[in-house]
Amino acid sequence: SRLTGVVADVRLLPGGGAMPVHHSQFFRPWRSDGAPRIQAQSCLGKGASEAQSCASALCVAVERYAAAWQGDEAMLLARAAELPAPAITPDMLSFFSAEQRASARPGERAAQRAYDPQTPQAWTPAWSLTENALRYLPLAACYADAPAPWADFAGWSSNGCASGNCREEAILQGLLEVIERDAVAIWWYNMISRPQARCAAAAQARAAQALGPD
């Protein structure tokens, strides 16, 4: 609310050692369709100091709150060809093949449905920083817990979402997170062996602090 703000709680977790970790909590906004949901959401933040860790946990909570779908977001319901500006279509964001969709087994996380250009979608207006122009994105790719049928074709992910003290800082944080997740995914999902990082070889004190004595 306007009185209590977005973040309900921020506290330092015990046992953080050289890298302090803060826990934050926020209450997700009520959906306009009245659908039930778990209201309390937890986040974590880390840093080289307690102040950095606290700020990180605070910003993550604000980021996740802002990403929650409420039902009052700006949107257009149309086919991509009918939009007043180019669209980033669901098939440009999700790279599932027909074979992957056909081979899904019961209990596995389902892939999004194949995008049909003739099916109207819910689109969110966005500003492209690379093109410096208006673009439209699938609403379900921009907000967490967007309802069906829009979420059948696209899904939200926190990867690349970031908040900051200014627009430039938020952009940098989001870019670095995408680079980080992409680098990890390359070796993790391909099960590629990688050498261990040795603390003694760390070039900076902060890297050594993050790695720890072991």
Label each PLM-derived region with a short phrase.
Residues 1-214:
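Helix-coil modules at protein/domain termini and other flexible surface or pore-lining loops
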